[in-house]
Each structure stands twice: as structure tokens, then as C-alpha cells.
């Protein structure tokens, strides 16, 4: 089986792709399955006064269910979500997952202490090592708080946005905390 379970569409604030175009591309690449996992981050700070990373779940499900039916003989289509995790919104996230019939849930950490590492403000006032450690500490809190996800997404998200391109990321600097993260993730899957 060849598939992709981390696919964003126009339903995510960071993507403009039409779901049907992505389905056609997946078929052309020989994929058997595709799972749409658009972003929902309830605690993402508004941009220019606009709430982002929220979806209209009814429209999302209706659109993807219709496409699933149209392409059922060519590719298996699943409806999932990439959910931004944070202990302060655990109840809201859990309720959201339970009230929707997602086939697959990616848990991710995008917001750490109110900031996304994508933005320069996240990095201000701390060393790169301190900032990266705060990211892993947030993930550890999330994996010990949450159970309503199938896989944890892009643990290396922070590495994309390290502002100093000369910085050498040394995995052993974060060995202990990443070891605890992995043990919690593995325990959850048992």
C-alpha cells in the first residue's frame, strides 16, 4: 500500500490546493490511499484580526465524502485532521475529535507559549538551544496529556525555522527529553 496521510488543502489556512487536484495527483503517482489532514489549531493567534487554522467541519466532511464516493473505485480516501495540541485546550480538542468521525488524527505542536516557531518573536530573548528545548518540553506535555490522536506530526517542525542557518543542531543535546517523548508515544500506541 502506498499512501499519504499528511495532506493539506484549501481548508487549511496555509494551503490553497483543491482536494480533487490532490486526489488526481495521488492517483497519477500510483497511490492507493490518501488521507486529508487539514489544520485545526484552536489556540493559534489571529493574524490581521482573522482567526486562522479553523475549518468548517460540515463543509470539510461534505466535500471530502463526495470526492470519496466519486473516486471510490480508484483510490481510498480518508478524512482526517491535523490537530494542534496544547494542554490548555485539551478538553476542547478532545470534544472536537469525539464529535467528528475522523478516520485519522495527527497531533502536532505548532504553538509554544503563545508563539509559533515560524515567527521571529518565538526566538526573541532566548538562545536557540533554549528555544528548541521549550519546543520539546511542550511536546512532552502534549504526549503525556493527550490520547486522542493516531500519530504525532513532525517532531522536527522547529528545525525548519531556526533563524541562524549556521546553527548546528546536535541531537544529543536533546536526547533525554526526546527519549521521554518517544517512550510516551510508543506507550500510547500499545
Report residues per predicted region.
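An N-terminally biased module of ancient metal coordination in phosphate/nucleic-acid-related enzymes
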Residues: 1-87, 92, 96-97, 159-162, ...
Amino acid at each position: 500500500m502506498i499512501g499519504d496521510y499528511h495532506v493539506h488543502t484549501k481548508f487549511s489556512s496555509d494551503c490553497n490546493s483543491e482536494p480533487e487536484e490532490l486526489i488526481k495527483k495521488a492517483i497519477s503517482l500510483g497511490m492507493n490511499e490518501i488521507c486529508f489532514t487539514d489544520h485545526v489549531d484552536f489556540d493559534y493567534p489571529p493574524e490581521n484580526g482573522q482567526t486562522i487554522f479553523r475549518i468548517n467541519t460540515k463543509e470539510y466532511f461534505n466535500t471530502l465524502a463526495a470526492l470519496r464516493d466519486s473516486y471510490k473505485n480508484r483510490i481510498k480516501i480518508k478524512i482526517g485532521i491535523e490537530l494542534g495540541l496544547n494542554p490548555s485546550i485539551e478538553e476542547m480538542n478532545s470534544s472536537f475529535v469525539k464529535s467528528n468521525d475522523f478516520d485519522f488524527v495527527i497531533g502536532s505542536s505548532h504553538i509554544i507559549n503563545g508563539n509559533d516557531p515560524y515567527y521571529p518573536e518565538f526566538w526573541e530573548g532566548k538562545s536557540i538551544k533554549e528555544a528548541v528545548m521549550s519546543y520539546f518540553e511542550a511536546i512532552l506535555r502534549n504526549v503525556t496529556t493527550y490520547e486522542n490522536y493516531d500519530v504525532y506530526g513532525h517532531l522536527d517542525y522547529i528545525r525548519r525555522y531556526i533563524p541562524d542557518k549556521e546553527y548546528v543542531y546536535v541531537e544529543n543535546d536533546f536526547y533525554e527529553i526526546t527519549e521521554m517523548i518517544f517512550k510516551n508515544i510508543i506507550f500510547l500506541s500499545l
